[in-house]
Amino acid sequence: METITEKNAATFTHLSSLTQYFFPFGNYIFPILIWTSKKDKSEFVDHNGKQVLNFQLSLLLYSLVLIAIAIPIFIITIFSNIPFNAIIHDDNFVINNFNFDNNMGLLTIGIIAVLIFGLLKVSEFFLIIYAAIKTSNGERFKYPITIPFIK
């Protein structure tokens, strides 16, 4: 049976990952601070701290993969329609018409990558809240789609 202090520390570990919306890298810094200060005193806090950090690191990896897919696709799609000689030799170059017919498959993959990224961020927010509620009730929580970097 976990004490109220352990439940609170574990809950704040989950909720501290929401600081990413206020501080850059807050979703890593604050959970690490809470987890390292309490992990030796409580196995419950240790478990939840590892879950939070593994989830955040997994989301970082997934986001980097999606960005690595989406950005080159959008760059290729946009620049394949621009005549570079016209840009170099004409000061008044205006793009009149984009023809995406040749790159529709690439553009679709890029849009899907951006949509999956958005879905990851929305689900991250709700999973953090759900994990905090479960943890405050004394239940162990394991995030879905998480790679166990820290064991």
Predicted regions and their residues:
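Membrane-proximal intrinsically disordered regions of secretory-pathway and membrane-system proteins
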Residues: 1-6, 89-90, 106-111
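Hydrophobic alpha-helical transmembrane segments in multi-pass membrane proteins
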Residues: 11-28, 54-83, 105-128
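Membrane-interface extramembranous regions at the lipid-water interface
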Residues: 1-57, 130-151
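Membrane-helix boundary connector in multi-pass membrane proteins
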Residues: 101-108, 133
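Membrane-interface elements of multi-pass transporters and channels
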Residues: 37-41, 72, 76-87, 139
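Membrane-interfacial helical/loop segments at transmembrane boundaries in membrane proteins
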Residues: 81-101
